[in-house]
Amino acid sequence: MMMMKWIISILTMSIMPVLAYSSSIFRFHSEDVELCYGHLYFDRIYNVVNIKYNPHIPYRYNFINRTLTVDELDDNVFFTHGYFLKHKYGSLNPSLIVSLSGNLKYNDIQCSVNVSCLIKNLATSTSTILTSKHKTYSLHRSTCITIIGYDSIIWYKDINDKYNDIYDFTAICMLIASTLIVTIYVFKKIKMNS
């Protein structure tokens, strides 16, 4: 009975790195998409464009830095809002880069917004792109408040990442080695008992 507990615990420990790696990608794909949602405030008073974006940052992240660029051409406003986040209980290095960019077109009564959001997870080398096209909102007293929602979501794993390949190889080698050790140990115990 004691031997069976040892076998189960060793196999569990050998499988954990593989499960942790795949679950982190799944967790990123399902939960971190909420980082792209929030409210976008557009205000145009006295020919000055003011854009304010309040992103939704979950409790599990700490905010590091933010950038905002705004360009205007006729009735079009182009903006890019980027921010860097890290996991609260992770390393000091940023683990997520979120970049929200878009085109806002306005007239006297309404504004139309095209928005795309890129989430780059540096820990798992995965990226998610969310896009939204031609959402129209009413313009009230030169202010347009948009609630950002998306039409399509594309998720992909970065191809040129050499560290994940090394990690995958190491995890598989650990799994094979621990399985061989347990198998040899079990055969020796069976041989000694017979």
Curated annotation (Swiss-Prot):
InterPro entries, sorted: Orthopox_A43R
Cytoplasmic side: 187-194
Species the sequence originates in: Vaccinia virus (strain Copenhagen) (VACV)
Family the entry assigns: Belongs to the orthopoxvirus OPG172 protein family.
One Pfam family this sequence matches: Orthopox_A43R
Keyword terms of this UniProt record: Glycoprotein, Host membrane, Late protein, Membrane, Signal, Transmembrane, Transmembrane helix
TM stretches of this protein: 166-186
Ranges per topology, Extracellular: 23-165
Glycosylation sites: 65, 114
Subcellular location: Host membrane; Host cell surface
Topology relative to the membrane: Single-pass type I membrane protein
Signal peptide: 1-22
Annotated Gene Ontology cellular component terms: host cell membrane; host cell surface; membrane
Coiled-coil positions: none
Record-given protein name: Protein A43
